[in-house]
């Protein structure tokens, strides 16, 4: 009896819940003002209200951050890197689960973006992220104030091709 119930629940998740989320929150769609509320678990803990969870220097480090938009029954949004809690940001939808979605922040600064943030962007894997970070480090080693003139030249120097799909993730 319990196996039937569990199997039925999984069937509903696969055949109804996930397709519904994909329709309501399509990949590439932008969710405005996501409020970040917990790190490395869906449960908000008292420690999450204190440093280092709320400090800006945590942004882009390894971990998972969960957030929601304000609403009566908001969807859970996961980012595959740490974001300071008690902050809000706009997010591009990058994936779907049965009851939640995955996203990456919009308008990140290409001069300060981390490897974890880069590798969370669809089409940029871990190897490409490290190539980009490596090229930025080489440039900064010569002159710490120097920056690439634009994102496309940064990608080109790293031997990677720029795709217009990447544009929402970076600030101009």
Model-derived regions, located:
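ATP/adenylate-binding site constellation spanning eukaryotic-like Ser/Thr protein kinases
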Residues: 5, 72, 115
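A short structural micro-motif
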Residues: 138-139
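Terminal RNA-binding accessory module
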Residues: 13-111
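Single conserved hydrophobic/aromatic residue that forms the stacking wall/gate
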Residues: 1-14
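C-terminal extensions
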Residues: 109-120, 134, 143-172
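Short glycine/proline-enriched turn or capping motifs at secondary-structure junctions
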Residues: 4, 87, 95-99, 152-164
